């Protein structure tokens, strides 16, 4: 956990906390509700110490997490349930409900479906993100100086800091996978927009390629789409020279940003 949190903070990403494996606290360690509550306090305290130690000073106070603020969720990813405190208290008065479900289920995992139906883990994660994670415009206003090595006062630097969809198009490919012999790059659009058929310079590779097949992720599927604007995640199929960690800029860029324009290797 420390390694992951430190990576996030180094890249000026706000971390949120999901306390996983609650089932083990109940079934293996046989903790009661009060002991589980104390364990939560310890985990949250240790998490906040990491923020104090590694977060930039201007973010430290606002990025610390608390159960009462719904910046912490808890549950069991294995059994598919999770909740923030407010989500839990909307349906149950105490944690004894969860403990009773596990006691009644024994080794019969199908009886745990009641928790999955009552508190779907994806709802908890989505609520935490929607309520607490910054939107792309706000995030890029302070993140870009930490993750991009180009000049901030250039046209490109200004577009990146404001997530300007009308600025030069700049992307970062965080993941590249191969499916059925075809590469699929997952990229964040930091400025500008990408339209099917646009040509890009892959900065590290020094190659130009066209994005002839783009889409957005819908769960496990990729929905083909003609264009995507800054602040979004795009899937690009078929790039031959793309690798994870590549920075991409529209090949016709002729602005005033000079020198090294690639993003730092984002963890």
Predicted segments, located by residue:
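Structural and coupling elements of P-loop NTPases
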Residues: 1-267
């Amino acid at each position: 956990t420390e390694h992951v949190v430190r990576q996030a903070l180094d890249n000026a990403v706000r971390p949120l906390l999901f306390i996983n494996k609650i089932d083990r606290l109940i079934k293996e360690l046989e903790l009661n509700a009060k002991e589980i509550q104390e364990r939560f306090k310890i985990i949250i305290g240790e998490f906040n110490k990491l923020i104090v130690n590694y977060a930039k000073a201007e973010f430290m106070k606002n990025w610390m997490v608390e159960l009462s603020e719904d910046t912490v969720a808890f549950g069991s990813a294995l059994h598919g349930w999770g909740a923030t405190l407010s989500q839990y208290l909307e349906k149950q008065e105490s944690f004894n409900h969860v403990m009773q479900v596990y006691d009644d289920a024994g080794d019969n995992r199908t009886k745990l479906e009641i928790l999955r139906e009552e508190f779907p883990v994806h709802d908890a994660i989505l609520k935490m993100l929607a309520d607490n994670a910054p939107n792309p415009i706000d995030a890029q206003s302070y993140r870009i100086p930490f993750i991009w090595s180009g000049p901030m006062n250039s046209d490109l630097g200004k577009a990146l800091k404001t997530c300007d969809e009308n600025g030069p198009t700049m992307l970062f490919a965080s993941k590249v996978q191969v499916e059925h012999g075809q590469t699929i790059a997952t990229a964040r659009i930091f400025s500008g927009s990408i339209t099917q058929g646009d040509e890009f310079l892959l900065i590290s590779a020094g190659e130009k390629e066209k994005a002839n097949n783009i889409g957005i992720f819908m769960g496990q599927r990729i929905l083909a789409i003609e264009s995507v604007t800054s602040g979004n995640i795009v899937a690009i199929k078929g790039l031959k020279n793309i690798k994870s960690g590549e920075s991409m800029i529209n090949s016709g860029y002729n602005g005033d940003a000079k020198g090294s324009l690639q993003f730092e290797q984002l963890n």
